[in-house]
């Protein structure tokens, strides 16, 4: 919608800069085991699409970036910070035996996993409030047959946090807990850590430009400021390299990531979202791209290049 508005109005010819519109897949880093298999096969390097775009060099000549995310309710908003994370694929290996006739001859990998999860819960009181830690594992395989002692149990989890040092501190505690489960019953455990997403830090000057347009379109009473959110996005990796923003547009009902989530106000979610992005692009690139250049000039990147960014993930994971 934003692309059509800028193009068919002819305003794009009056702007001092180029605008690229990307459709980037895989913003949600679910299906950890499947994506791990793609990484193992060399088909991808990261869980998220925007990280992959960075690694492939598509961001090398981009100065600023923005995306917009749907949200429940009638309100829109700009965001400041949110969590980053690392992902874990956990494989407990036990020994099969007849679950009724000779369970003492087996090693129950499900018991190992359950103890590991309980040990994670015992660590929660050690997570600092300011780190906004979230750990939410799921068991993706609990065994094969009900009458066989489980010998193959698999767990996926994220360890989220506001800063990467906080994430890594919590991650070490989670690993100890998972290893304790295996030790308790004599099982083996393999923990594979996969780069997740960097924490988001929306550029404030950029946010201000976007917020003014939201005020015009929906009224300031419908514009919120979302701060220190526990959720994550692969856009955080973009925001560590170039000035970028990840605002929210209302128009949905239901819970985020829930089966009842659906569009309730198409006008707000589709049309207003497109207008807000197009208006912001005009504000950035009008008058010799004065505002865009100011934002770029004042931006302090976490990583100054793609190479520095990739090296940082490599160091964090080893």
Please provide the spans of the model-predicted regions.
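DPxDG-like acidic metal-binding loop motif
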Residues: 1-4
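Histidine/acidic-residue-rich, glycine-tolerant segments that coordinate divalent metal ions
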Residues: 6-9, 13-136, 143-148
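Metal-dependent amide/peptide-bond hydrolase catalytic core
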Residues: 114-318
């Amino acid at each position: 919608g934003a692309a059509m508005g800028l193009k068919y109005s002819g305003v794009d010819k009056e702007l001092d800069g180029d605008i690229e519109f990307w459709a980037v897949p895989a913003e949600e880093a679910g299906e950890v085991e499947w994506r791990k298999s793609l990484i193992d096969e060399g088909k991808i390097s990261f869980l998220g699409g925007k990280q992959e775009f960075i690694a492939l060099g598509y961001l090398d000549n981009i100065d600023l970036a923005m995306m917009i995310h749907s949200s429940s309710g009638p309100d829109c908003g700009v965001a400041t910070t949110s969590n980053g994370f690392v992902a874990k694929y956990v494989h407990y290996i036990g020994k099969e035996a007849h679950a009724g006739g000779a369970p003492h001859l087996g090693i129950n990998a499900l018991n190992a996993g359950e103890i590991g999860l309980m040990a994670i819960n015992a660590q929660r009181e050690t997570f600092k409030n300011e780190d906004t830690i979230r750990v939410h594992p799921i068991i993706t395989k609990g065994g094969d047959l009900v009458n066989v002692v489980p010998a193959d149990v698999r767990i996926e989890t994220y360890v989220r946090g506001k800063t990467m040092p906080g994430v890594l501190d919590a991650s070490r505690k989670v690993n100890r807990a998972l290893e304790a489960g295996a030790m308790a019953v004599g099982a083996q455990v393999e923990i594979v850590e996969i780069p997740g997403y960097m924490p988001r830090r929306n550029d404030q000057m950029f946010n201000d430009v976007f917020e003014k347009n939201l005020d015009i379109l929906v009224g300031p009473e419908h514009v919120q400021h979302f701060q220190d959110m526990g959720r994550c996005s692969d856009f955080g990796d973009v925001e560590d390299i170039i000035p970028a923003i990840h605002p929210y547009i209302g128009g949905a009902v239901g819970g985020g990531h829930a089966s009842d989530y659906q569009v309730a106000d198409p006008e707000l979610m589709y049309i207003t979202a497109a207008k807000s992005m197009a208006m912001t692009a005009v504000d950035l690139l009008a008058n010799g791209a004065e505002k865009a250049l100011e934002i770029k000039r004042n931006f302090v990147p976490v990583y100054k290049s793609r190479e520095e960014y990739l090296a940082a993930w490599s160091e964090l994971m080893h």
